[in-house]
């Protein structure tokens, strides 16, 4: 078990109620964990974690991942917007990826195996080896959480930057940064980290419940030992996916070219060792992370 990424904190100054977030990975089976610990004002770290993402991702975490309550998004490059991951068989690049077998062969569109592989990526264990029709890679017996190696978690609480309300830029009535800070004050804290299970994960900072999984569409690849299909390869060695540390800032931007500019908290994610891609998510309000197509299009800004 190892840890390569640095720790993160829920506040810029150590105070009562502060949390420390640590990541781990196990190179024996490439499982991972994100843990939250209470942090005392004197800097003492609790010996027992408040929560563990690995435990949240236990066997009974998912019912039927393709239809249940897990919120997962991806990017449809052709449409130019975010979509629900469970609907990604309708995206050209991802479907081609799901159809690739370890030997490099591909199957016809809309095959049962592509559907099964998507369900596997979303957490289903029904097709894991040895007792399955497809013998996909068996993940850690206790959890499907993948390794987090270089991605340092980032905590997002209340907006706390100091953008001025005055200046040369006309924000318009009700669009001042001070208005945004007031409106977003008290929003639920969330912690974000990239995983080599293919997704950037968002967790409720207090409970560890997963709020969102984002599978970047640009990571789709039909090459061997690459792409999302490789995660299900029974001979999987290791591959990096969302390996970069997410960064977050408040920006006065449009959600789309046709939309209106507004203050938003924007997360920029990257692949690091996993590739050369970037993506942006609107993380202003975690309560917007819902399993609807409209929310997927709203939250995912671009890749």
Task: Map each language-model feature to its residues.
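A fold-level detector for beta-propeller and closely related beta-sheet-rich head/sensor domains
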Residues: 1-303
């Amino acid at each position: 078990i190892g840890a390569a990424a640095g720790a993160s904190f829920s506040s810029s100054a150590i105070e009562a109620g502060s949390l420390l977030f640590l990541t781990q990975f196990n190179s024996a089976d490439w499982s991972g964990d994100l843990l939250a610990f209470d942090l005392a004002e004197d800097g003492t770290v609790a010996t027992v974690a408040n929560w563990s993402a690995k435990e949240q991702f236990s066997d009974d975490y998912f019912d039927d991942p393709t239809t249940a309550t897990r919120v997962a998004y991806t990017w449809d490059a052709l449409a130019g917007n975010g979509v629900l991951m469970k609907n990604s068989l309708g995206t050209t690049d991802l479907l081609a990826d799901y159809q690739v077998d370890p030997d490099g062969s591909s199957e016809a569109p809309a095959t049962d195996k592509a559907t099964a592989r998507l369900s596997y990526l979303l957490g289903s264990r029904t097709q894991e080896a040895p007792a399955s029709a497809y013998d996909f890679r068996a993940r850690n017996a206790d959890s499907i959480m993948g390794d987090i190696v270089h991605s340092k978690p980032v905590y997002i609480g209340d907006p706390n930057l100091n953008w001025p309300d005055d200046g040369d830029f006309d924000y318009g009535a009700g669009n001042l940064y001070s208005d945004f800070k007031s409106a977003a004050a008290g929003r639920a804290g969330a912690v974000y980290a990239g995983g080599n299970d293919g997704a950037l994960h968002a967790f409720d900072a207090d409970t560890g419940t997963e709020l969102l999984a984002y599978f970047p569409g640009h990571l789709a690849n039909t090459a061997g030992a690459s792409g999302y299909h490789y995660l299900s390869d029974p001979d999987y060695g290791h591959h990096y996916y969302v390996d970069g540390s997410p960064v977050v800032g408040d920006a006065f931007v449009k959600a789309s070219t046709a939309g209106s500019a507004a203050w938003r908290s924007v997360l920029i994610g990257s692949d690091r060792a996993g590739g050369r891609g970037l993506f942006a998510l609107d993380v202003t309000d975690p309560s917007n992370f819902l399993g609807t197509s409209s929310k997927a299009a709203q939250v995912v800004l671009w890749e």
